[in-house]
């Protein structure tokens, strides 16, 4: 009896001890807040308040308590994929507090699987795809705009899923291997495993999107997990803020390759960064960096395609192009050095497509299409209301510049209107319009009234600025709050009042003193912003430390606040202020001085397919900084949208700082292979270096790749008349496109074709665009794709054209868009299915080849 009583008492004691232990170690709201502050980057800790993070944590735990799946989410997934507020490099906002109840009402009675699908439908109801610059808007700003690029769409969806307690993460390929672009989508944790979906692109099931096949061709697929994550995925790297993992083996075939870095004597180089590069946008772009161990080795798991591995030390560098799966071990020899003029040519072959699509019944597809149509109608009604409000504002102003500004505001029109009214009340309308004209289009869509007022009221007037400065410099380099890709904040009053009046005058008259102040007072550490999230100027001033990029933004912001014209040079990234001329700022040198300048004269002998090469599309230039080659940015439009200058618009010769460079050019083939040509060259002070831009061409001539029955009929969507390609075209070649209502791949295709409108109108290639239904055609027309060539024939396919193409050309199902070039003899000489960048140029290249064969 005593033994039994002893055992009972002991058991009870152990039970209560375990309960207390569990309570002590439970992941509480307090622990979650500490977790956020332990791993968040410096900018997030100084630019946002503790109250803000408390609110976000509160809603995460509220969702865990109220959502039916809350108790089933493991602590690891909840901690790393629900609690974190940040998804990418977006501005943070109060999305959770604002939309929790609305989203809860949509999903509280659903299974976890169906809830993920429903949240994506909710996102699509508010947002559709459209390209923009590289700065990522906050989720609520994206909703206000009603559209965003893939990075903004996926940031919105991840935020929305986390808001209702569903673990979610953004997955991205830094660069595609088979075409010039990148992409981001979302993975959600459902019942023990991760599933993917296209953000704001609802499908009837998970693991389905237009990018199934492109994803299978990726070399790298990464996600950055907040904190020190110990999940089952392969870890690429760990930092003070995040764990970078790869998920590429979930989408296609992969292999692990080991790399050894040695010097010219064969000695292994320990603790050395190795950059892994993908050819994309006419450059070898670094997509991941790893560090060698004590044996000079590191490794990478990647898709079965070609990449470049690069390393440098003490001014010497080495590189090796490799194809994953061909060799288990690759050696990089540091046997190149600055000043050596060499030429290299590589064929960069992407992985082959290998995708498996989940089953979707006709009923599921029909219901999903019905939902999409309804969501489109809601979003289009919102857009129409915005347009009406914009037109009303335009009608009430006679200022043509202001009219153009209002047209760009989308859902932010009221903020801009309120600002203009505020400025008019202070007799400052001209200055206000100048300010609005010198921020980006995206700024017009998401800037706050507080920011605009601060910069209007606290920016020195032109008369208070440097007199020798050209008048146009005032608006762009003093008045404008936009410096780089930072979050705009109301910093002017704080920065302009920071120094006493006498000190402000000293800095204004002698900007080198301001350079010295920043050197001496702002501690620089690039580990403070490993995710490349700029710290705001106010945050830098508060913390007195920053990464180099945030320091540069801070200097320019402070200089402008003191009436000094300043910028980060958009081409080479140099920080500069304007005295009698633009002067480079060097925070690492005793004195700032401009680099000696030489010139580059690029010669090009036109070929039929490319008469005027385009930067980022056909060629790029990089400068050696002693360790890496840094891309020069020759943008035709706003920076960050990857739209480069035509070679014909470059200065001839083009001024460049003295130094060592590489000119890379490439030709993208139909199968995604890139034929590259790279030249190392030097620029010497006062001298002109002449180079010839080489675009390699394939040796093969025009080839028949399949057949298509040109007698297949389609129906005119407007008249109901039935016709076929043979009747319309007779004995010529033609372009046939099978399109959908306007998905992201179709949108890209239309934009690529519109970019070459005049070329297509002058060509001998008629275009026929067909759709699977009149409803799809009507939705496509609602998209208002501007700039398409005249004379396009539209049709409705009853399935015969689709079935013929899929079967005869061995395509992967009805994955649109599908483009072919064929003739009325049923010969197909070009085929492209799904997501493609540069389609317009590829079609015209085939048109040139057709013309040459007929001569």
Predicted segment positions?
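Short, ordered, surface-exposed loop/turn motifs in non-cytosolic proteins
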Residues: 264-283, 305-306, 510, 607-637
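Short, internal strand/loop/helix patches
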Residues: 781-816
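Thiol-/selenol-based redox modules, centered on thioredoxin-like
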Residues: 816, 820-855
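Hydrophobic/aromatic-rich core segments of domains that either
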Residues: 21-22, 105-110, 115-121, 130-140, ...
